[in-house]
Amino acid sequence: MADAFVGTWKLVDSKNFDDYMKSLGVGFATRQVASMTKPTTIIEKNGDTITIKTHSTFKNTEISFQLGVEFDEVTADDRKVKSVVTLDGGKLVHVQKWDGQETTLTRELSDGKLILTLTHGNVVSTRTYEKEA
């Protein structure tokens, strides 16, 4: 099922992302730049390893992981987190934990689009991506 996520995805819509970043403690200037950026996400699968690359004018990040196996991650806003990604009901669920906090990034496919739902506490942001040809 993870194969369905493979491809290059371009951000086309973003809701409540500034509030999400604010809840994580991201500073004003960084939030301003990040809010204006339209990243491209590249998802690849090689055997049991999934790689998610996010490219933008703001920052490039890359993570590689196996489903259900915890790994260390440095986020785009420089948080050092323990992450685990699972496949749950056709959704890729990515949980990041640090300093007693937790945020969840859920990727799901809907009508040919990739919907990324970011949750931190009671703050929810939705970012919609379309697949590039």
Swiss-Prot record:
InterPro entries: Calycin, Fatty_acid-bd, ILBP, Lipocln_cytosolic_FA-bd_dom. The modification Phosphotyrosine is found at Y20. The keyword Cytoplasm applies. The modification N-acetylalanine is found at A2. GO terms for biological process: brown fat cell differentiation; cholesterol homeostasis; fatty acid beta-oxidation; fatty acid metabolic process; intracellular lipid transport; long-chain fatty acid transport; phospholipid homeostasis; positive regulation of long-chain fatty acid import into cell. SUPFAM superfamilies: Lipocalins. The modification Phosphoserine is found at S23, S83. The modification Phosphothreonine is found at T8, T30. Heart, but also skeletal muscle, kidney, brain and mammary gland. GO terms for cellular component: cytosol; extracellular space; nucleus; sarcoplasm. Forms a beta-barrel structure that accommodates the hydrophobic ligand in its interior. This is Fatty acid-binding protein, heart. It comes from Rattus norvegicus (Rat).
